[in-house]
């Protein structure tokens, strides 16, 4: 063998690789010059012999007979891909050949890159290079092959695969090459029959080495065995799970999805009613990628939530499976290990048979474009810890923010300030939730501020005259009693109709009669019948008694009034709340669906029944606190009501202690009366939205919006306010 020639070739290759690495956009995806003295990662086959050949310090793969060494490679996520291979030979005779070959289809067919025959067997290496047809391919193969008599040798050496990360033509491209070390949810597991156990959510997450997907999903995903498979275990001592029918089983699953680059988008967003007696689905966008160990399949992981039917409790999880363009699909694995629910904490997990039916989805391009717009409109996000680095002189102790709530019961929390969303939370019983940006949280009674408060403020702004003083009985036909002659829309919003059973602030709300007569019934006639049945006790507008029923009646009244203006087919929630507020604000499609009565009335609950992702929460808070009810400079909410909400003064009604009030669907707390000295010389009433179990969205007077969604009955946020006051004073 011509050793000098070979060594010069190796030096030249090293110099070439040094140049390649100096180019910022070029990456070496694979290289092997066998200088390690091993080719153990190659697959050897055929008759004949192979050996490590070492001569004067240089190493190569030596083959003779009918022998070949094969290596699987991937260029997934890369363009401008180039492959080079060297082949040399000694002692060939006529009919002997040595091949360096590559395949673009997983080895089904092969292309010759270098061919060495008799007369070219001086030992010098012959190089072949190809730079076309190799881009974005997870199924590349290379091989060295001998077709010789025994003792006639082929020498394979210096395999180099390079490429440039794909940045164009694919939405949100990945930079990995598919080299992922996976110990759970492997391809063999998902295509096998082993039992699934609960595990850290990192196994469901997009890994750092993930490559762009080689397959594209568009069509229907159907699951089988939902009614008989699956596990659910209650966490804690409430022992409420036995009261839920078919609790361990998922609802039936048959939904369409569209892929956009590395993102996996459900066609149907927001809560999906279904027929399961206990749970409804919410599907969120996930990710698609390739891993070299998945045998040409692409891998999907997407978040989903189960919501309690007729109520707001929410459990968040992830589903994952493998698929190919031809409809091949693995089993689907799923896991839930966190919730926002005060009385029922559950882990769900299981594996189900799946089917993928490729199909052209109507409006797929619109779905993709809308999704890209949705993502682009999210407020820029930083981890909560960045508050300390962004405001280094403040002395803020970030660990104290959110500390009013026991960490194990916190779903999400964060702060919006100066155009940045500082986000925390997303911890589960099994690690960090991998899709925090679309973790679904229930509104509970924050809907009273949003649907009730913003809804009436919009109605007041939208039409001439005064709508907030309209009578409830004029627009809710079920309220026929004389006790409803006087209460107005705004008094229902204030929960000050004067109609109640007990004068205690929350006694009626917490009663069994309320649970049985309102929360557990499904039709508008039942809900309205109960809501209208409270007797007269005092003059409307003079006493606060917490009644979700009042907000329900307000929602019905606003809806009926809107129909009188816009036509019998009009829908206040869809037409006004979604089209005139949510969409212009850039809220997620998840927020565009409200819980409704299960009848032809389809009446939105108004006082609860909304779903948010964290970006929705900060936008809804800033809509009032920062934009004062304006969208892109246009007054969308009534300015008078906005001012009365943000600057309470002597308004509102006492709602508990002297430091608590309620007005226009918002709670208020007076910082002047707090045990911490904020330096307020006069009363400083802070409006906030509040929800059952531990939900607060606080419109702080320093321009911040603080939120926390938790489920341990801890509603206070004072420790967070103290820290945020260090960054910007509440009472300057």
Q: What are these model-predicted stretches?
A:
Residues 95, 147-163:
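Extracellular carbohydrate recognition
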Residues 180-202, 461-500, 533-536, 563-607, ...:
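Active-site helix/loop module of the DD-peptidase/beta-lactamase fold
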Residues 26-66:
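Extracellular glycan-recognition surfaces and repeat-rich motifs
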Residues 442-468, 492, 554-558, 617-624:
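Active-site SXXK
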Residues 525-535, 539-544, 562-568, 591-700, ...:
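Penicillin-binding protein/beta-lactamase superfamily catalytic region
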Residues 388-413, 480-587, 612-618, 622-626:
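Active-site-adjacent helix/loop patches that line small-molecule binding or acyl-intermediate pockets
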Residues 322, 392-435, 696-697, 705-707:
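A short, well-structured edge-of-sheet supersecondary motif
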Residues 108-135:
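Extracellular carbohydrate recognition and processing domains
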């Amino acid at each position: 063998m011509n050793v000098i020639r070979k060594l010069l070739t190796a030096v030249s290759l090293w110099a070439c690789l040094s140049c390649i690495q100096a180019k910022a956009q070029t990456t070496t995806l694979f290289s092997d010059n066998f200088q390690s003295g091993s080719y153990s990662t190659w697959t050897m086959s055929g008759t004949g012999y192979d050996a490590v050949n070492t001569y004067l310090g240089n190493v190569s793969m030596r083959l003779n007979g009918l022998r070949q060494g094969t290596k699987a490679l991937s260029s997934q996520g890369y363009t401008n891909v180039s492959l080079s291979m060297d082949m040399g030979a000694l002692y060939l005779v006529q009919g002997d050949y040595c091949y360096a070959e590559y395949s673009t289809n997983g080895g089904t067919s092969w292309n010759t890159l270098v061919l060495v025959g008799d007369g070219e067997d001086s030992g010098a290496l012959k190089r072949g290079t190809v730079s076309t047809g190799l881009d974005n391919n997870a199924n590349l193969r290379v091989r060295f092959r001998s077709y010789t008599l025994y003792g006639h040798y082929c020498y394979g050496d210096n395999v180099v695969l390079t490429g440039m990360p794909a940045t164009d033509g694919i939405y949100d491209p990945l930079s990995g090459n598919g080299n992922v070390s996976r110990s759970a949810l492997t391809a063999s597991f998902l295509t096998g029959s082993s039992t699934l156990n609960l595990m850290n959510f990192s196994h469901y997450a997009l890994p750092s080495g993930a490559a762009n997907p080689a397959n594209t999903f568009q069509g229907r995903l159907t699951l089988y065995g939902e009614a008989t498979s699956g596990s659910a275990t209650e966490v804690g001592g409430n022992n409420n799970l036995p009261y839920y029918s078919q609790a361990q089983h998922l609802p039936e699953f048959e939904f369409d999805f569209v892929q956009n680059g590395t993102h996996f988008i459900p066609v149907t967003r927001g809560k999906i009613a279904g027929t399961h007696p206990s749970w409804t689905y919410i599907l969120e966008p996930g990710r698609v990628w390739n891993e070299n160990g998945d045998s040409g399949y692409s891998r999907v992981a997407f978040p989903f939530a189960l919501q309690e039917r007729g109520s707001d409790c929410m459990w968040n999880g992830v589903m994952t499976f493998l698929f190919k363009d031809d409809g091949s699909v693995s089993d689907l694995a799923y896991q839930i290990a966190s919730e926002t629910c005060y009385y029922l904490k559950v882990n769900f997990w299981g594996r189900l048979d799946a089917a993928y039916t490729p199909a052209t989805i109507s409006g797929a391009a619109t779905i993709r474009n809308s999704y890209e717009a949705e993502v682009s409109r999210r407020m820029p996000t930083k981890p909560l810890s960045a508050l300390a680095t962004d405001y280094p002189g403040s002395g803020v102790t970030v660990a104290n923010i959110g500390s009013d709530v026991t960490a194990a019961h916190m779903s999400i929390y964060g702060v919006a300030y100066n155009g940045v969303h500082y986000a925390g939370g997303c911890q589960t019983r099994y690690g960090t939730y991998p899709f925090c940006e679309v973790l679904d949280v229930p509104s509970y009674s924050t809907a009273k501020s949003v649907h009730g408060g913003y809804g009436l403020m919009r109605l007041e702004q939208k039409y001439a005259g005064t709508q907030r003083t309209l009578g409830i009985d004029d627009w809710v036909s079920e309220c026929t009693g004389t006790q409803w002659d006087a209460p107005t829309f705004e008094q229902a919003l204030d929960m000050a109709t004067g109609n109640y059973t007990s004068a205690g602030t929350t006694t009626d709300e917490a009663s069994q009669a309320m649970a049985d007569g309102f929360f557990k019934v499904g039709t508008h006639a039942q809900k309205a019948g109960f809501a209208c049945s409270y007797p007269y006790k005092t003059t409307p507008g003079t006493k606060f008694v917490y009644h979700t029923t009042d907000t329900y009646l307000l929602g019905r009244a606003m809806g009926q009034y809107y129909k009188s203006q816009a036509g019998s087919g009009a829908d206040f929630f869809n037409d006004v709340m979604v089209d005139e507020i949510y969409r212009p604000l850039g809220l997620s499609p998840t927020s565009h669906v409200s819980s409704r009565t299960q009848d032809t009335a389809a009446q939105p609950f108004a006082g609860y029944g909304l779903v948010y992702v964290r970006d929705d929460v900060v936008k809804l808070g800033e809509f009032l606190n920062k934009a004062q009810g304006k969208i892109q400079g246009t007054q969308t909410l009534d300015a008078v009501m906005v001012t009365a909400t943000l600057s309470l003064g002597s308004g509102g009604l006492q709602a508990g202690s002297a430091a608590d009030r309620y007005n226009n669907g918002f709670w208020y707390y007076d910082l002047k009366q707090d045990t911490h000295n904020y330096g307020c010389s006069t009363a400083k009433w802070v409006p906030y939205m509040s929800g059952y179990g531990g939900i607060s969205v606080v419109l702080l007077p320093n321009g911040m919006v603080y939120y926390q969604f938790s489920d341990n009955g801890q509603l206070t946020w004072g420790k967070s306010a103290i820290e945020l006051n260090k960054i910007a004073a509440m009472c300057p």
